[in-house]
Amino acid sequence: MAEAGESLARLVAELDGLGSACVAFSGGVDSSLMLAAAVRALGAERVVAFTAVSPTYLPEELETARRVTRELGVAHEVVETHEFDDPGFTSNPRDRCYHCKAGLLDEMAAAAARHGCAALVDGSNADDLGDHRPGMKAAAERDVLHPLLAAGIGKEEVRRLARELALPTWDAPQQACLASRIPYGESITIEKVAAVGAAERVLHGLGFRQCRVRHHGNIARIEVEAADIGRAVGARQEIAQRLRVLGFAYVTLDLDGFRSGSMNEAPEDVAASGLTPAGAGTA
């Protein structure tokens, strides 16, 4: 693994010649590192952070984004999304993320033009190439730059660099759009994502930092890290009671534990496990 200084130098070099940049900034560790590197390369006055606001994101994510931009001294603009107006999103096909990301990036590109930014960049890293990410196609069509990816920096190195730069998000749990909790082919509604978000906040409040609540109709399928499964079993009565209040008739615990992108598991992989696939989504 490269030394942190060398990795950061490669990343800054990817940004050096841009003159100015607008950063698609979720408030997560990847885009936080991207934003900090842009400030190093270009100066805070030549960088603007754009954060999407949508029912598919937890409100806490915007709070984190505001905190990081304040600490870095960067101008911050909130961009409202309109994915629930797009049947290509709400019908929840396998390329759902393409439709969502296309609309969002169009909004951000227009905002970048208003700010006179030379480039729109995001926090996609080298490890993102290995997952099902239709949103990358939307980014490519709009000339969005991926400096972390171009510098060959993956998730583990992102966290290491973020820690060395003392970014408050260096150990933040992985986040993903709440729509990714709904199996492909099942309609996405504001009510469903609100129920998922509220359920995950219940788990966060009980100390489960990395978790997902998958929405299977009236069934909530909970994923926590493998090391936390025993603790989740111990808290099962409280968890079940509080999630039933949110509209879930049945509350289950996935014994495979948390895994990002579990809704993308191929049917043959699920069949090999002896389970029957119930659908898919990203995250």
Which residue stretches match the model-derived regions?
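Internal, active-site/partner-interface "lid" segment
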Residues: A172-K192
